[in-house]
Amino acid sequence: MATAASNPYSILSSSSLVHDSAIMQQGSPFRNPQKLLQSDYLQGVPSNGHPLGHHWVTSLSDANPWSTSLGSSPLDQQDIKPGREDLQLGAIIHHRSPHVTHHSPHTNHPNAWGASPAHNSSLTSNGQPINVYSQSGFTVSGMLDHGGLTPPPPSGTTQSLHPVLREPVDHGDLGSHHCQDHSDEETPTSDELEQFAKQFKQRRIKLGFTQADVGLALGTLYGNVFSQATICRFEALQLSFKNMCKLKPLLNKWLEEADSSTGSPTSIDKIAAQGRKRKKRTSIEVSVKGVLETHFLKCPKPAAQEISSLADSLQLEKEVVRVWFCNRRQKEKRMTPPGDPQQHEVYSHSVKTDTSCNEL
């Protein structure tokens, strides 16, 4: 019988594990586990002279009773057993850590503890085999702490495959910032658009062009005809930011063309080519307005001959007199509510008043 100093399980047998000291005395197969081969183990078992020990080894090698539970024979697999200090800490402090961990093909770790096929069982001095899985210190619950018979993967592998560490660095933000910085150089701000719209309206009125003239001029110069409503909405800042940015350079070029052509001998022709020039508003003197008002009270809708004779007497264009009578009739309709006296009665009363005023 070997001494207690040569038994690596002597400390555990007296403290945490409930094993017979006589059972765990055989320690020679575990002294150098990395040097012990399967052939040496098979040669050493029959020399003890116990028939059950030899029968146990041969039956495992032939019938393979472990195939139904663990997938392969313990003699064909490479088992992993911790050393002395690991067993002591696992039994006394960490009660949940397994004393025996099967080494399966899924968890092949070359840098694990020293492995040997002889670690699956221990022999007593009489040569009787002891199955360590049947002892109280090696319960099934200890083997199933990590779920099933499959041992947990090494900690290094788990940490290296952590989802957070596997996530690639997102460079989308960097690309978007780069594109944003590039676009900011060309895209004007809302304040710049507001200031340009104000200046454009002032310069357009100063040059004598309507909003429709600008739309036609853009179609003549650049091939994009814009309506009067579009130019109006641009000046009122009622277009979308994207459309404002698209329309701003076109209007800016049109202003540059209009300013450069001003003062030259052919400035009128160039401006007329850009679009329909705005007609100047006709200003009528107060005395002339009185004469027209008198004729309107007499005849709200004069004939073409009367308009021509009146235009000649007032030294006005025939079109100006015609437009004035047309606007005056529209004004009368807006001012006269329904149900009032007939217009000819009002006109006759007004004629007398106006005649007296004119004579004065």
Curated annotation (Swiss-Prot):
<keyword id="KW-0217">Developmental protein</keyword>
<feature type="region of interest" description="Disordered">
    <location>
        <begin position="332"/>
        <end position="360"/>
    </location>
</feature>
<dbReference type="InterPro" id="IPR010982">
    <property type="entry name" value="Lambda_DNA-bd_dom_sf"/>
</dbReference>
<dbReference type="Pfam" id="PF00046">
    <property type="entry name" value="Homeodomain"/>
</dbReference>
<dbReference type="InterPro" id="IPR001356">
    <property type="entry name" value="HD"/>
</dbReference>
<keyword id="KW-0238">DNA-binding</keyword>
<comment type="function">
    <text>Transcriptional activator. Induces neural-specific gene expression to act as a key regulator of neural differentiation.</text>
</comment>
<dbReference type="InterPro" id="IPR017970">
    <property type="entry name" value="Homeobox_CS"/>
</dbReference>
<comment type="similarity">
    <text>Belongs to the POU transcription factor family. Class-3 subfamily.</text>
</comment>
<dbReference type="GO" id="GO:0000981">
    <property type="term" value="F:DNA-binding transcription factor activity, RNA polymerase II-specific"/>
</dbReference>
<dbReference type="GO" id="GO:0003677">
    <property type="term" value="F:DNA binding"/>
</dbReference>
<feature type="domain" description="POU-specific">
    <location>
        <begin position="185"/>
        <end position="259"/>
    </location>
</feature>
<dbReference type="InterPro" id="IPR009057">
    <property type="entry name" value="Homeodomain-like_sf"/>
</dbReference>
<dbReference type="InterPro" id="IPR013847">
    <property type="entry name" value="POU"/>
</dbReference>
<dbReference type="InterPro" id="IPR000327">
    <property type="entry name" value="POU_dom"/>
</dbReference>
<keyword id="KW-0804">Transcription</keyword>
<feature type="DNA-binding region" description="Homeobox">
    <location>
        <begin position="277"/>
        <end position="336"/>
    </location>
</feature>
<dbReference type="InterPro" id="IPR016362">
    <property type="entry name" value="TF_POU_3"/>
</dbReference>
<protein>
    <recommendedName>
        <fullName>POU domain, class 3, transcription factor 4</fullName>
    </recommendedName>
</protein>
<feature type="region of interest" description="Disordered">
    <location>
        <begin position="98"/>
        <end position="130"/>
    </location>
</feature>
<dbReference type="Pfam" id="PF00157">
    <property type="entry name" value="Pou"/>
</dbReference>
<feature type="compositionally biased region" description="Polar residues">
    <location>
        <begin position="118"/>
        <end position="130"/>
    </location>
</feature>
<feature type="region of interest" description="Disordered">
    <location>
        <begin position="143"/>
        <end position="191"/>
    </location>
</feature>
<keyword id="KW-0539">Nucleus</keyword>
<keyword id="KW-0010">Activator</keyword>
<keyword id="KW-0805">Transcription regulation</keyword>
<feature type="compositionally biased region" description="Basic and acidic residues">
    <location>
        <begin position="164"/>
        <end position="182"/>
    </location>
</feature>
<keyword id="KW-0371">Homeobox</keyword>
<dbReference type="GO" id="GO:0005634">
    <property type="term" value="C:nucleus"/>
</dbReference>
<dbReference type="GO" id="GO:0007420">
    <property type="term" value="P:brain development"/>
</dbReference>
<dbReference type="InterPro" id="IPR050255">
    <property type="entry name" value="POU_domain_TF"/>
</dbReference>
